[in-house]
């Protein structure tokens, strides 16, 4: 298990390992999976209110997201609107196709596209968007960790 590779997503860890001098064949044959994770602050359940999304939020989240939950601040959350944290993950499971893609030096985008289509991998943004739609966290928190 390796941690803290300072990458924006799980797939970019492949390039990061190669940049650190790990031979491509070792990266391809040694990895079992890759996980990127971030912590998002959770909306305080005591002061959460349903609010309309702004134009900027709809551009980021999608036009279908008309309302979100946001904390207005209370004594339970020290007037921050947030209480607690939750992890969002991006998980890439290695398979023979991905191993070949690594050896062939396919792009991060190509590997990500393959994983999303064939493994149903969710990006950090997609995982976080689910939490925003469920009212667990806010668009602001998701924007902080999303590099898409």
Which residues make up each language-model segment?
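Short, flexible helix-loop junctions that flank or precede catalytic/ligand sites
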Residues: 1-148
């Amino acid at each position: 298990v390796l941690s803290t590779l300072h990458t924006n997503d799980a797939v970019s860890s492949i390039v990061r390992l190669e940049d650190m001098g790990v031979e491509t064949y070792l990266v391809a044959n040694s990895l079992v999976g890759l996980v990127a994770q971030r912590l998002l602050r959770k909306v305080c359940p005591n002061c959460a209110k349903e609010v309309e999304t702004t134009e900027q939020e709809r551009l980021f989240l999608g036009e279908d997201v008309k309302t979100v939950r946001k904390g207005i601040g209370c004594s339970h959350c020290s007037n921050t609107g947030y209480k607690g944290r939750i992890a969002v993950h991006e998980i890439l499971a290695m398979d023979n196709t991905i191993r070949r893609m690594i050896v062939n030096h396919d792009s991060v985008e190509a590997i990500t596209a393959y994983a999303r289509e064939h493994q149903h991998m969710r990006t950090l943004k997609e995982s976080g968007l689910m939490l925003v739609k469920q009212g667990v966290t806010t668009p602001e928190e998701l924007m902080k960790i999303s590099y898409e």
